Amino acid sequence: MPTLTQQKIRIRLKAYDHRLLDTSCDKIVDTARRTDAVPVGPIPLPTRRRIYCVLRSPHIDKDSREHFETRTHRRIIDIYSPSSKTIDALMKLDLPAGVDIEVKL
């Protein structure tokens, strides 16, 4: 079990498509395990829903509206006791363009 004094890498992932996000998480966890690091996660965070209300008509009829929604799915992966091999392997990892990645050391 990880202790408080160990070094860790925290990776935050965001995407609109949850399937793309889960495959990216699996790639990161597999890469960390291959380099003898200890991955914890992926931990799902709450999904952010943004709802936009738009009038359907360009002029009148304010009663007629349309709603659009974007959902942002988020995950966190913690990697404990990383080595230089772990960091190199994570940097070389090819992830899809639809996934936003934040890395904190």
Swiss-Prot record:
GO cellular component: ribonucleoprotein complex; ribosome
One GO term (biological process): translation
Pfam families found in the cross-reference section: Ribosomal_S10
InterPro entries in the cross-refs: Ribosomal_uS10 (IPR001848), Ribosomal_uS10_CS (IPR018268), Ribosomal_uS10_dom (IPR027486), Ribosomal_uS10_dom_sf (IPR036838)
Source species, domain of life: Bacteria
Alphabetized GO MF terms: structural constituent of ribosome; tRNA binding
Key words, A-Z: Ribonucleoprotein, Ribosomal protein
UniProt similarity note: Belongs to the universal ribosomal protein uS10 family.
Oligomer status and interactors: Part of the 30S ribosomal subunit.
Protein's job: Involved in the binding of tRNA to the ribosomes.
Annotated protein name in UniProt: Small ribosomal subunit protein uS10
Species assigned in the record: Synechococcus sp. (strain JA-2-3B'a(2-13)) (Cyanobacteria bacterium Yellowstone B-Prime)
Higher taxonomy: Bacteria, Bacillati, Cyanobacteriota, Cyanophyceae, Synechococcales
